[in-house]
Amino acid sequence: MINTELHNGDCLEYMKKIPTSSIDLIITDPPYNLGKFMEERDTNLVKMRDNFFGAAGWDDLDYKEWKKSMNKFFHQASRVLKDGGSIIVFMAIIKVETIIQLAQKHGLYYKKTGIWHKSNPMPRNMNLHFVNSTESWMYFTYKTKTGTFNNNGKVLHDFIETSVTSNSEKKYGKHPTQKPEALMEHFVKVLSNENDTILDPFMGSGSVGVSAVKNNRNFVGIELDENYFNIATSRIKEVKKDEI
């Protein structure tokens, strides 16, 4: 039977309680620390920043504080990962170098930076500049240069294209940076095996958890915001059809 463990609170505190070398795969989408960056720009994105970016908690932190928090995250991530375990971290392209440097300090081997392309992005400011249709992700393994990689003989590109999150995946509520299940399921299937344990310390509305449970993986999720935690819990319960 697949086990799920969900926590509403600070991931830096809850991760300390996770046993060492107990996690096979981490997939997570931490705050991008774009809040203050957007606030200081003289554009009409300030309202979007107030409504969306600011809701992400760490996103409004001073850069040095955000970097310090991410360093603590990688310290715990490397501790809980099994040797040969993998981690996928979504991040703004302008922060990729910082994330790689922090991760490598904690024994994580940098494998790849890839792109998620949204095939139907919001056409916001389409007459002013190029529409924002991509986000980056980074792939690391712990203590080894290789890990689980279920490509089944296929060539898997580092450019992944899906539509944005559908309304059916938002029926319990919306999250401003919600990733589609199809995207998360891709990483779940390729980088883990059935009965492995997957962790998402920045769970949001639970797309990683839903994908993990659907594919017979154990799941540990942590989310600071109570509203998003409740959305994630409802989504995962629906898939699991069991009491968490």
Language-model features, listed with the residues they occupy:
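S-adenosyl-L-methionine-dependent nucleic acid methyltransferase catalytic domains
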Residues: 1-122, 128, 152-244
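Core SAM-dependent methyltransferase catalytic element
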Residues: 82, 130, 136-147
